[in-house]
Swiss-Prot record:
One of its GO terms (molecular function) is tRNA (guanine(37)-N1)-methyltransferase activity. GO terms for biological process: tRNA N1-guanine methylation. CDD domains: TrmD-like. The keyword Methyltransferase applies. It catalyses: guanosine(37) in tRNA + S-adenosyl-L-methionine = N(1)-methylguanosine(37) in tRNA + S-adenosyl-L-homocysteine + H(+). This is tRNA (guanine-N(1)-)-methyltransferase. Belongs to the RNA methyltransferase TrmD family. The lineage of its organism: Bacteria, Bacillati, Bacillota, Bacilli, Bacillales. The keyword Cytoplasm applies. PANTHER family: TRNA (GUANINE-N(1)-)-METHYLTRANSFERASE.
Length: 244
């Protein structure tokens, strides 16, 4: 996979892209990450990438020319049209399902904005997706693009050493992940549940499944709204409700 990030602040990505999973993914050649300063594409004699909004108002608006030119340059040798994703608080809420969808693409371009916003022609004629990572305000789209990049890249084949850990992650199964414990079995009187030390894998799997359901019901009940619960999950959920 190829991921290009269009930004005015490329230095922000050095630490994130040069460590942990993203670093390993690049070393394994599972992904090619490029950070591009779209100011390099401006034709303005003052090297500017923004201007005052027509009709007046506060703030500056990113002009279309440098962003259009940057995307066109990055895709001039690409046979398949890439997904061009605008980081935008008005966009579709980012979810695990969206991450899985994007992980199936060959080429992604993330556009990170600043200032008051983007010229609307960028939205209408250039991008394929607009994505938001939450209902809050950030200084720019850089942090959002880092979050999405990490979420997508870890899904690529061969990136994670243990495929099972990826499958069991919160949201991957539609439920929040079950609790985890490690040594010691008794820490200051706080004990690990007996079932986890029983060696009975069937009972352990059932405990983890039920605890995932419990945690989801308690912390994110909205995730259960569209879930087609199995007969066993319905039984467990009734037990969980009685235990509350």
């Amino acid at each position: 996979m190829k991921i290009d990030i269009l930004t005015l602040f490329p230095d922000m990505f050095t630490g994130v892209f040069g460590s942990s999973i993203l670093k390993k993914a690049q070393e394994k050649e599972a992904v090619n990450l490029r950070v591009v300063n779209f100011r390099d594409y401006t034709t303005s004699k003052h090297n500017s990438v923004d201007d005052y909004p027509y009709g007046g108002g506060a703030g500056m608006v990113l002009t279309p020319q440098p962003i259009f030119d940057a995307v066109e340059d990055l895709t001039k040798e690409t046979e398949r049209k890439p997904r061009v994703v605008l980081m935008c608080p008005q966009g579709e809420r980012f979810t695990q399902k969206k991450a899985e969808e994007l992980a199936g693409e060959e080429h992604l371009i993330f556009v990170c904005g600043h200032y008051e916003g983007y010229d609307e022609r960028i939205r209408e004629h250039l991008v394929t997706d607009e994505i938001s990572i939450g209902d809050y305000v950030l200084t720019g789209g850089e942090l959002a693009s880092m979050v999405i990049t990490d979420s997508v890249v870890r899904l690529l084949p061969g990136v994670l050493g243990n495929h099972a850990s990826q499958v069991e992650d919160s949201f991957s199964t539609g439920l929040l992940e079950h609790p985890h414990y490690t040594r010691p079995a008794d820490f200051r009187g706080m004990k690990v549940p007996d079932v986890l030390m029983s060696g009975n894998h069937k009972n352990i799997d059932e405990w983890r499944h039920k605890e995932s359901l419990r945690r989801t019901y308690t912390r994110r009940p909205d995730l259960l709204d569209d879930r087609d619960l199995s007969k066993q999950e319905k039984k467990w959920l009734e037990e969980i409700k009685r235990e509350q």
